[in-house]
Every structure is written in structure tokens, then in C-alpha cells.
């Protein structure tokens, strides 16, 4: 039996005391020689559970005499180490078929202060539909990544004292590092991420999160294969070449040279639409192949009335503002063309703001109405003319507008037919009626509506891609459909079939023109879309 005394508290352990008393007291709100309060008891229990170090937290009170109590807190620790393995089958419009596997290692109470260290590895192999053609071997595409994080149940920076954020708000610091590498997936992206995050709860329903640093380094290793990978874009250029420049030769290796040499002011005067198509392809090349460093800071506020995961009648609101590159640009190197770089990589400067609202109504013991609305805007400035691809908005997919595949819709009323359509303004709403079929099988009827637009003054985007005011809301796409879900208790397997109901890029008649099984989209997802 081991024991210790600290600040009027006695600590006992069957073996050695493995938690620093000072660290545990950060989660204990029962004070010696103070009047008993239910609020202090509940706060203590909840905070100790939130440490994710104990499988059992039990509080006991015994009477000493008529006006005094002794309080005992019994803690049963979880195993210090845990290992988890996972496997997954993957299917999408980009990755036709794939398999992934992961391994994660968890170390609780890493430094005897209830910290949690997590190290994970993930690997995937895919059969890619838009392969470069250099290797036709099945499953020749892969992605590997590793992440490490340290969660500390307190603030570690001396300028953030308990006087600023008191311990009853559950202050937390998280450090994380991650990296991933791809082969034969798109442009073979290399990505490194480092995050320093602070969070606390001002009330049980209000959460504040500050990312003091979210640094992302993105490098594309296979930009020379761009037009082999994004073949639809090359085919559009090929059509322009064959119609207007039959004496010219164009290949995937000289497509950019063709644009710069032939798609000039004179061509624009005679063929404005095809000029715009070529320039859009050039712009998308710049966005998708851009190597960048994005050192951002952000603040997020979340208001959530959900009591626990079984609560189906609640309200959720989240607002987040992030800005990238401001401090780093001061310290950066300025090149001859005025571009500021770090390690010869341009620094991305932009501001992004997102607002999300969700409301759930429990209409009976076996049915729920769910509503979700999202609005997001990202504006480049200073060192950047475009938003990095990873910070841009897309539309479509299993958790978005389910009648369109990921990246297939927008911007606006345009219908580019190109891969990976992204932009800098997004608005989406979804309404879903969820009901039980039996104990495990669930059903759903849904309607999704939204789109992405361009809100910059760029001359390279067409009028049908831009958001110009309320009139642009006419270009909101609408999809409807139904879903079947199976509840495994620990996750929900979801099959949603979406039908194109209103297509903003069509002519005069935009309603129900492709409302059929042939043009529907089957979405396979894990858990609910929102």
C-alpha cells in the first residue's frame, strides 16, 4: 500500500501511486472544510471520467458526526497500454476498390499526469480508375501515413493560468504531428501536419477551441502526369486543338505549352467560350499542383445541447474562423517575383470562416427529423491568388448532396465535366426523416440542397461560377432519395440512394430531367451523414 498527502487530500494505492496528486486535483472540486454541494460532486465525477484514464469513478460519503462528512473517491484505472487494429474496404468514384489497415498504440498516464499518448499507422492499397497508364498492375496505388498525438488535461503554457481559464472548465492541450505519402494516387501528394490545440468548456454546452498553430506542408511529387491523371481535361484541350489548330500536336506532356502559346487574346476574340474552357483548365492545374505551406491559427465555438449519444432531440451550432500565413509571411523569404516562401515553398495566405447548424426533433420513440445547414467562405489575399486545394470547398458525396458524386457538382450553374471541382464559397442544407424498420435496420428519406460558388474577383472564372447575390441561389442543386442503415451499436452502416431532382446547369427545364435509377448515385457510408 502506497500513500501520499497533498493540499489536505490523502491518496492511497494498492501498489505504487502512479498519478501525480497535483494532476488529479485539477479534476477534483470537492474542497476540505467546505459545505457539501451536489454540483461539486457531479463536476468531479464528470471531469475524472473525461480524463479517459479510468474505467470506474465512484464517489462515497460517510458521516463523521452530525455536521461533517468524509469524501472518498475510488478510481479504477484502465490498462496503461492498449493496441487497436482495424481494416476497411473502400469504394468511391475516385478509388474504384481499395483496402486499408491500421494499427494504433495508446499509452495512458504517459508522464503520470493523466496524459494520453497515441501513435497510429495507416496503410491502404487501391485500384484507381484514372490511373496514369504507366502501370496497369491491379492495386498498384497505395497510401501510408502515421500520426502521433499527446493529450494533456491542462494548459501547459504559463501565460494561461487558472485565473484566466479555471480548472472547472476542463482546459486541455493537444500536440499532434502527422505525415502521409501517396503513390499513383492523383499527384502523389506528400503531406506533413503539426497542430497545437487548446480547448475548454465555459459551460457543459459551450466548447471553445483555439488552434495556436495548424501548420500544413503539401508537396505534389507527380505534377508531370497531371494531364494523364485528369484525362477529361486533356480531352477538352484535345478537342480545341483538333478544331482550331489541326496542324499542331498536343500531348499530355505539352498541354500547358499549348495553352500559353495558342490560347491568346486573338483566340479569345473569336472563340470566347473555348478560350474560357482552356483558361479554366490552366487555373485548375495551378490549384491542384500548388505546393504550399499553410501555417494557420483558428478559433472555434461549439454549442451542443445533446446530453449523450442516445439523445435524439437536441440543437448543435459551430462557428470557426481561421487565418493562414500572416505571422509566417513576416519571417518568410521574398523571391524576385514578390512571392514569400518558406523552404522555397510559397506560403498560403487566406481567411476562412465556417458556420454549421444542426437540429434534431424526436417525433416518436422510433423516428427523428434531422436538419443540417452549413455556410462557408474562404478568401485568399496577400501572397495567394487561390485557396489551396485542401482548404477549398467541394460538393457532393455520401455526407453532402448525395445525388452527385464527390467533386462532380458546381461551381454555380457551370457543368465543366472535369474532375475535382472546388471553389471558395459553399452553402448546403439537408433534411432527413429517420425511422426504425426493426431493432437493427433503419430507414431514411432525405432532401439535400446546395452548391459551391466563386466569390473572388478572378477573371478566370466564368459568370455562371460566381456568386453575385441572392439571384445566385437559383443555382442551388437539389437531390432527394432514401436510405437503408444497419445499426451495429458501435457504428452504423449506411446505404443512401440519391436522385438528381433539380440540376442548375440544365436549360429551361431543370426539374426531374434525370430523376431515374440510371442517373442515381449509391452512397456507402459509415454512421449518419450529419
Predicted features along the sequence, with ranges:
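Flexible hinge/switch segments at interdomain interfaces of large molecular machines
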Residues: 2, 10-25, 271-275
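Gram-negative/organellar outer-membrane beta-barrel architecture
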Residues: 17-18, 37-318, 402-403, 492, ...
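Extracytoplasmic/secreted envelope proteins and their assembly/folding machinery
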Residues: 21, 25, 41-45, 354
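C-terminal outer-membrane beta-barrel translocator/porin domains of Gram-negative envelope proteins
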Residues: 9-10, 90-95, 209-435, 446-449, ...
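Outer-membrane beta-barrel domain signature, especially the mid-to-C-terminal portions
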Residues: 458-475, 508-515, 521
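Second-shell loop/turn segments in exported
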Residues: 8-14, 28-35, 135-136, 343
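C-terminal soluble interaction/assembly domains
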Residues: 31-37, 107, 463-469, 480, ...
Amino acid at each position: 500500500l502506497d500513500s501520499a498527502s497533498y493540499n489536505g487530500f490523502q491518496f492511497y494505492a494498492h501498489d505504487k501511486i502512479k498519478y501525480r496528486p497535483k494532476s488529479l486535483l485539477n479534476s477534483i472540486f470537492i474542497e476540505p472544510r467546505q459545505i457539501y454541494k451536489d454540483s461539486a460532486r457531479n463536476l468531479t465525477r464528470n471531469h475524472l471520467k473525461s480524463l479517459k484514464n479510468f474505467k470506474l469513478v465512484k464517489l462515497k460519503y460517510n458521516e463523521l458526526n452530525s455536521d461533517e462528512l468524509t469524501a472518498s473517491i475510488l478510481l479504477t484505472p484502465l490498462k496503461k497500454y492498449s493496441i487497436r487494429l482495424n481494416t476497411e474496404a473502400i469504394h468511391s468514384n475516385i478509388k474504384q476498390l481499395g483496402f486499408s489497415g491500421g494499427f494504433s498504440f495508446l499509452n495512458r498516464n504517459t508522464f503520470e499526469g493523466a496524459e494520453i499518448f497515441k501513435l497510429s499507422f495507416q496503410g491502404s492499397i487501391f485500384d484507381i480508375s484514372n490511373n496514369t497508364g504507366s502501370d496497369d498492375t491491379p492495386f498498384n496505388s497505395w497510401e501510408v501515413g502515421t500520426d502521433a498525438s499527446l493529450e494533456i488535461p491542462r494548459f501547459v503554457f504559463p501565460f494561461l493560468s487558472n485565473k484566466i481559464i479555471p480548472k472547472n472548465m476542463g482546459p486541455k492541450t493537444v500536440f499532434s504531428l502527422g505525415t502521409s505519402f501517396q503513390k499513383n494516387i492523383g499527384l502523389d501528394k506528400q503531406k506533413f501536419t503539426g497542430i497545437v490545440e487548446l480547448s475548454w468548456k465555459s459551460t457543459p454546452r459551450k466548447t471553445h477551441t483555439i488552434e495556436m498553430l495548424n501548420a500544413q506542408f503539401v508537396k505534389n511529387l507527380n505534377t508531370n502526369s497531371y494531364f494523364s491523371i485528369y484525362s477529361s481535361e486533356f480531352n477538352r484541350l484535345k478537342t480545341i486543338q483538333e478544331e482550331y489548330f489541326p496542324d499542331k500536336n498536343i500531348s499530355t506532356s505539352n498541354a500547358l505549352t499549348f495553352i500559353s502559346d495558342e490560347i491568346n487574346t486573338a483566340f479569345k476574340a473569336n472563340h470566347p467560350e473555348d478560350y474560357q474552357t482552356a483558361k479554366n483548365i490552366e487555373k485548375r492545374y495551378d490549384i491542384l499542383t500548388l505546393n504550399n505551406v499553410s501555417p494557420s491559427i483558428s478559433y472555434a465555438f461549439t454549442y451542443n445541447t445533446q446530453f449523450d449519444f442516445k439523445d435524439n432531440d437536441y440543437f448543435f451550432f459551430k462557428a470557426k474562423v481561421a487565418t493562414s500565413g500572416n505571422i509566417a509571411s513576416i519571417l518568410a523569404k521574398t523571391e524576385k517575383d514578390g512571392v514569400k516562401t518558406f523552404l522555397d515553398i510559397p506560403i498560403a495566405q487566406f481567411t476562412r470562416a465556417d458556420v454549421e447548424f444542426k437540429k434534431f426533433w424526436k417525433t416518436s420513440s422510433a423516428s427523428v427529423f434531422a436538419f443540417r445547414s452549413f455556410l462557408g467562405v474562404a478568401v485568399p489575399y496577400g501572397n495567394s491568388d487561390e485557396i489551396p486545394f485542401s482548404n477549398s470547398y467541394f460538393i457532393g458525396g455520401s455526407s453532402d448532396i448525395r445525388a452527385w458524386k464527390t467533386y462532380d457538382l458546381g461551381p454555380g450553374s457551370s457543368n465543366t465535366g472535369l474532375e475535382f471541382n472546388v471553389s471558395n464559397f459553399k452553402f448546403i442544407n439537408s433534411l432527413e426523416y429517420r425511422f426504425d424498420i426493426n431493432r437493427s435496420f433503419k430507414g431514411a428519406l432525405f432532401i439535400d440542397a446546395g452548391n459551391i460558388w466563386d466569390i473572388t474577383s478572378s477573371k478566370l472564372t466564368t459568370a455562371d461560377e460566381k456568386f453575385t447575390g441572392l439571384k445566385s441561389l437559383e443555382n442551388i442543386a437539389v437531390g432527394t432519395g432514401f436510405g437503408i442503415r444497419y445499426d451495429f451499436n458501435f457504428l452504423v452502416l449506411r446505404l443512401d440512394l440519391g436522385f438528381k431532382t433539380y440540376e442548375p446547369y440544365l436549360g429551361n427545364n431543370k426539374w426531374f430531367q434525370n430523376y431515374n435509377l440510371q442517373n442515381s448515385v449509391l452512397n456507402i457510408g459509415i454512421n449518419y451523414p450529419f
